[in-house]
Amino acid sequence: MAENNSQGIDPALAVQETGERQLSEAERRAAEEAALDDGSMTLTAHLTELRSRIIKCLIAVALGSCVGYYYVEEIMHYLTLPVGKLYYLQPSEAFFTYLKVAVFVGFLLALPVVFFHVWRFFLPALTRTERMILGVIVPTSVVLFFIGLAFSFFLVLPAAVRFFMGFGNTELEALFSVDKYFSFVLTFILPFGFVFELPLVITILGKMGLVGSDFLGRHFRLVIFLSFVLGALITPTPDVFTQSMIALPMFLLYGVGYLIVKYIIRN
């Protein structure tokens, strides 16, 4: 105490300054919440917030990419399990493929952060009810997207690779380039992430009253046809096998959405 007084520091004044800083911080937070509630943010404030959130999303992707590159050899090990050994045909091909894998993993790791900042940016324009609804929809969509990727990678992709490798013989041996193989894997699994959003989309449409269980039930045959058409459009190969691997889950997910609309939303 004597030392503090000798240095000219008043303990009471220090406590008062600390309390003022805490009060100003609380007031700042209260002002931000009030601006979110009444949507009174100016255009400059919106642009500043947009810039801040974009930077945070890019930082999240960059950090996720660093994590992905740190574990890139382990990731490549799991990616190559369906085919075994891969080759690179150019000196820089392996390096740039590793970078692509790291950035893709970084994007997946940062996806919840990106969705969160997108949701927070549009929050001032939403009512409290809409905020509660989006608070359920956004996490659900992220979970369904990852389930679709996992379903494709662990179940569909190995079967598809075995199917394509079955065309080899003694005169025709498979030789996979690491870059071409990763591009194939990427274009193969991504559509499943979006396809698995189908039950959520149907549920939202049913909740809004735009579709009902009767409407969904009457169009089952049309859905089967459209599932194969969409499977042909979004698959990287023109064969019926790959199209069926997308069309069948799409049809089953449509059935899940139908059951939700019929038995849950109706009640």
Model-derived features: positions:
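Membrane topogenic/interface segments and analogous intrinsically disordered interaction regions
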Residues: 1-267
